């Protein structure tokens, strides 16, 4: 038994995940009634979500309390990349929607959760989350609040003695080890998640909303494989695709199936460590990216709004399209603070064209129907871009300082 386990763990994690994926899909088609299999996925996602807030909190405190150099330049570059790529994603989505207009069959509205009434309300979430109670922030996975308090506490602990700093470092190292153990459970977790998806949804979603999904997923793939490489090349001045593919393998696969940027934070941090990035930097930029780097959300908001306008016969001129891009980018940055995420920001964007809430909520309902694909690809794009842009920004610093870039 021990030899079998060692042989299994010696196989590449990606290969093990693919094996779990295939087994989960087959079981979902053959025995869809065996719902207990899906518990494996729930346990895996729950474990990642549980460890992530603690990992971020102590990693940031430990990094800042022990830091001897300033990393403001790299962090500033990462934030600029996050904001620019989100706007670019919204703008690309507008162009794609104009080139490939989609009309939808609207369904009954989803009205369980109230959508924000304006972009000010959406952006208000960010500063309010900063001053949230730190215990509440940890319990509710409010990463803006966790980051804010961890930064303050970390700076305060810079004056602590070496023994205290060592304890903080030991705690962060211990949590990192727990993350490694959890990530090794990914094959079983992915098996459960894929089983649930296949057994509950089958393949009907692709026939009913195929064209809409093609535009959404096409935009997201374009951002990851065309525009993101341009940003990475600007940073490192060499072929970006080896890094692109490495981030895809390390981050996007798990993010696709967990459908949670928060749950993927430990995965991204582990990848940053393997890339040789500075812990003082990525301990801040990765959780920050899970909050404000929302390329996928910007695409979803834009494409769904443009599809609604096309369905209702509303023309969208160039100035309106640019305004929509800005609005979608700003709204996407606050998506993590809104229940329902990007889908419930669609009514806000629809209001730009005078589309009534009753119709907008029908579009939200369509979003929930296609969510099994849309949300999976969106999360994969968002989370893997956090890793990619964090790595690119630090490697830019390596290039400027004459250090060799390896990945």
Question: What residue ranges belong to the model's regions?
Answer:
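Transmembrane alpha-helical segments and their short flanking loops
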Residues: 303-407
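Helix-loop-helix junctions within the multi-pass membrane cores of secondary transporters/permeases
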Residues: 250-332, 389, 400-407
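Transmembrane helix boundary and interhelical junction motifs in multipass membrane proteins
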Residues: 55, 189, 260-268, 298-304, ...
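Juxtamembrane helix-boundary/capping and inter-helix hinge elements in multi-pass membrane proteins
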Residues: 64-73, 159-163, 201, 237-240, ...
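Membrane-interfacial loop-to-helix junctions in multi-pass transporters
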Residues: 13, 48-52, 140-144, 179-184, ...
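Signature of multi-pass transmembrane helix bundles
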Residues: 4-30, 45-48, 73-242, 406-407
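Active-site-adjacent helical/loop segments in soluble small-molecule enzymes
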Residues: 50-62
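Hydrophobic transmembrane alpha-helical segments of multi-pass transport and channel proteins
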Residues: 47, 83-87, 91, 217-221, ...
